[in-house]
Swiss-Prot record:
ATP binds at residues 8-18. It comes from Stenotrophomonas maltophilia (strain K279a). InterPro entries: QueC, Rossmann-like_a/b/a_fold. This is 7-cyano-7-deazaguanine synthase. One of its GO terms (molecular function) is ATP binding.
Length: 221
């Protein structure tokens, strides 16, 4: 069976991506990153999702982005209750580049040629590292920078949610049997994973379930 490394945050998008990769016949190795995020309950959610969806392995890697700072997700900066114009304060500098690089390294060790990530259409209007151009550029870099890219079959970066709305992601996840009740999206989630219901992540998540006509399983504080 082909191997793939899937970035798993513990949120609804990455849970759906795991199921999509498995449907394509990949043996999924899930990678989560403890980067200093304030909402650490998402890593607990990642462990739940990995177990429930039967991944081959789940690895959590520590990278202290809090020591660099620059984001409301790592610093003592208030998370806004509504999105605004421009790049939001919840953008973590270079986070997706760093996470994909870690996934790339693990893929090489595993002999895997495929990496999956959950960037999507809802995100790339505000986050520069969620744009299709970024995904294509990282794939090009991966094939220039690795032994697999130079001597092997090459690396493919999959972003299957790239052009899907949150509602479409929910519908696809439900079709594939994803238990979204295990996931955490909230930027202000408490230690038990209960969501605030007010931040931008909560708003987009709720809209997704409403759009899909699916009951919202989110635990709210």
């Amino acid at each position: 069976m082909k191997k793939a490394v899937v970035l798993l945050s513990g949120g609804m998008d990455s849970a759906a991506v795991i199921a999509m990769a498995q449907e394509q016949g990949f043996a999924v190795h899930a990678l989560s990153v403890r980067y200093g995020q304030r909402h650490t309950s998402e890593l607990d959610a990642a462990a739940r999702v990995a177990k429930a969806q039967g991944v081959v392995a789940h690895k959590i890697v520590d990278v202290d982005l809090r020591s660099i700072g620059g984001s409301a997700l790592t610093d003592d900066i208030d998370v806004p209750e509504a999105g605004g114009a421009g790049i939001p304060v919840t953008y973590v500098p270079a986070r997706n580049t760093i996470m994909l690089s870690l996934a790339l390294g693990w893929a090489e060790v595993l002999g895997a040629n495929d990496i999956f990530c959950g960037v999507n259409a809802v995100d790339y209007s505000g986050y520069p590292d969620c744009r299709p151009e970024f995904v294509a550029a990282f794939q090009a870099l991966a094939n220039l920078a690795t032994k697999s890219g130079v001597e092997g079959a090459g690396i493919k970066v999959h972003a299957p949610l790239q052009f899907l709305s949150k509602g479409q992601i929910v519908s696809e996840g439900v079709r594939l049997g994803v238990d979204f009740g295990l996931t955490v999206s909230c930027y202000n989630a408490d230690a038990n994973g209960a969501a605030c219901g007010h931040c931008d992540a909560c708003r987009l998540r709720a809209q997704g379930f409403a759009e899909a006509g699916v009951p919202d399983p989110t635990l709210y504080a």
